[in-house]
Amino acid sequence: MGLLSSKRQVSEKGKGWSPVKIRTQDKAPPPLPPLVVFNHLAPPSPNQDPDEEERFVVALFDYAAVNDRDLQVLKGEKLQVLRSTGDWWLARSLVTGREGYVPSNFVAPVETLEVEKWFFRTISRKDAERQLLAPMNKAGSFLIRESESNKGAFSLSVKDITTQGEVVKHYKIRSLDNGGYYISPRITFPTLQALVQHYSKKGDGLCQKLTLPCVNLAPKNLWAQDEWEIPRQSLKLVRKLGSGQFGEVWMGYYKNNMKVAIKTLKEGTMSPEAFLGEANVMKTLQHERLVRLYAVVTREPIYIVTEYMARGCLLDFLKTDEGSRLSLPRLIDMSAQVAEGMAYIERMNSIHRDLRAANILVSETLCCKIADFGLARIIDSEYTAQEGAKFPIKWTAPEAIHFGVFTIKADVWSFGVLLMEIVTYGRVPYPGMSNPEVIRSLEHGYRMPCPETCPPELYNDIITECWRGRPEERPTFEFLQSVLEDFYTATEGQYELQP
């Protein structure tokens, strides 16, 4: 275990179609096109784009039309592409003859690896590990992806069970001059499909016999850009998830078919204008590690609608039976995901101001996203807390406690406390100390000691660096993301040896 040389590497400053047999896949679709790209509302044209070559694709997944200009398709349905501009393609179904728009990442050419349920073309090594380590994937679950380091080559990633717990092992798939493939030179295959078929019958030197392709949950439905302010009757509140400083949070449904989280304003704690300001900040910040904002109801009681995260907040999850059994590498990877989201906030010249485990949400696949931007603000250089504003003392940097001045460096301090929450499986920071005692102790240079469950390298090289007294001496989130992602790779080989 240890750190790579990330400190030196990262700045502190931060065609024609013919009938074929289609094998459709069961894995979940990739994310739908972003909110900012919703130009597919232009009326469908009855004629094909003159510059568009005649092209036929197959639907990789079901797509339910959201608007009357969309084309509803079923997995395996063949389509003719009429226009392929941007993230939305105009297509005609060869089954129904209807025309409309479909997300471009929901279709693929009829003769392509994309129709194989085990093929994840552009997924990174790190995300491949995260997906394979999800609870629904068992030992032997696998995927094939394009190599990040060798363009045109492929890698096989397999979930394994060792004495250290669940791990993912990676194998290089090498190409032959005649177009074949191999992992071990003693046996070659004409296609990737043949390679998968062989290692699915027997492991033949791999860590596990290949069992099932890596699975994902169904994707979230598209949310159209023009559905920002929505009618209250389009929402159904089903189950109360909790309450906070600004209101309650419910699990519910939009238009009876899309599961969402709905945050309601608690009257008297925040003006409608401030609540809508929170929503507008969230709307401008879009990243895969940030909980996504979908819409708002602007008439009181005001609602804010976001994506639903099935496992709830990280603080509560760490205290469950499943959470308490998470290995240290999984905990550090969760920390890296939070740092990735905060690095985006840092690049966007914004701050969070309430970063703690209670405001990190966990998905069904145990991916973490940053939530609750009620206190985040777009800033020039710093945001001064308004008189009377509340903030959690045990997570707050000294300069913010004493002077009410918040910068991204105050978020870095909070991140150090968040790391302590994670490695102690949700223990309250500064156990046994009151808020005034914490303030006095920090003034005299006190810092929480290294827990027994925390590696010294993590505590000395990362956590305590976040707690530097001078804000400018604290690391950037870019740096923190880098060292946390690399924490366990310094002593690991990038690939398994040839079987």
UniProtKB/Swiss-Prot annotation:
Where along the chain is the active site annotated? D354 (proton acceptor)
Principal EC category? transferase
Residue ranges of the region described as Disordered: 1-34
What tissues harbor this protein?
Expressed in immature Vgamma2 gamma-delta T-cells (at protein level). Expressed in the B-cell lineage.
What up-regulates or down-regulates this gene?
Expression increases during B-cell differentiation and is under the control of the B-cell specific transcription factors PAX5 and NF-kappa-B.
Gene Ontology annotations for the cellular component aspect, listed alphabetically? cytosol; plasma membrane
Q: Where in the cell is it found?
A: Cell membrane
SUPFAM superfamilies listed in its UniProt record: Protein kinase-like (PK-like), SH2 domain, SH3-domain
Effect caused by changing Y495F: Leads to constitutive activation of BLK
Q: Which UniProt keywords apply?
A: ATP-binding, Cell membrane, Kinase, Lipoprotein, Membrane, Myristate, Nucleotide-binding, Phosphoprotein, SH2 domain, SH3 domain, Transferase, Tyrosine-protein kinase, Ubl conjugation
Q: Tell me the residues on which Phosphotyrosine occurs.
A: Y383
Tell me how the protein is altered or processed after translation: Phosphorylated on tyrosine residues after antibody-mediated surface engagement of the B-cell antigen receptor (BCR).
What's the superkingdom here?
A: Eukaryota
Q: Please state the Enzyme Commission number of this protein.
A: 2.7.10.2
> According to its UniProt record, which protein family does this protein belong to?
Belongs to the protein kinase superfamily. Tyr protein kinase family. SRC subfamily.
> What role is this protein assigned?
Non-receptor tyrosine kinase involved in B-lymphocyte development, differentiation and signaling. B-cell receptor (BCR) signaling requires a tight regulation of several protein tyrosine kinases and phosphatases, and associated coreceptors. Binding of antigen to the B-cell antigen receptor (BCR) triggers signaling that ultimately leads to B-cell activation. Signaling through BLK plays an important role in transmitting signals through surface immunoglobulins and supports the pro-B to pre-B transition, as well as the signaling for growth arrest and apoptosis downstream of B-cell receptor.
Query: What protein is this chain from?
Result: Tyrosine-protein kinase Blk
Q: Which organism is it from?
A: Mus musculus (Mouse)
Gene symbol here is: Blk
